[in-house]
């Protein structure tokens, strides 16, 4: 029988946090104590396995209560709090890009290099790769293993949900109404494709494009 865990979820009320909750429910992963954490959403509630949980304040939470903490609240939050969780004995899985390029932080896709997890010496930070990289490598790795891939020409189409709830709401409003305010993106996003994801860098590539290049060089297949 697998051990039940005490889980903290930072950003529990966000788009990604909500999806994480639904995956844990679907996979029927044994959770002993669940701690939804946030800042602006403190006092709100989330439903997990038919139980109602009140979101607690991240800044004052006793992180030693959690065996594992998943950070899904962006780079700034991860930068401020993630390492303190590790120092208190918690394994931290960070979904942002904050720690992906640190030499001492493993960048893990379980299907590709999950063996790294068995080699960890106690609580540590674990970085989650860019979503495009994860999907790409899961598909490409078995092909590369058997036939060797030399060149990749990659095109990705990013979901509006990746920008957050405000972007989803803006898309919904634009679909429902002929005219709607454009606040999140530089142009109307409904029925449109904008050839830019994240900021442009000095080399004229966007940061999102460079994340793919950087992370492919870190995760060896």
Regions found by a protein language model. Name each.
Residues 219-221:
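Conserved small/polar residues in nucleotide/adenosyl-binding loops
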Residues 1-189:
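N-terminal Rossmann-like NAD(P) cofactor-binding subdomain of oxidoreductases
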Residues 172-173, 178-179, 183, 188-191, ...:
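Long, contiguous binding/interaction regions
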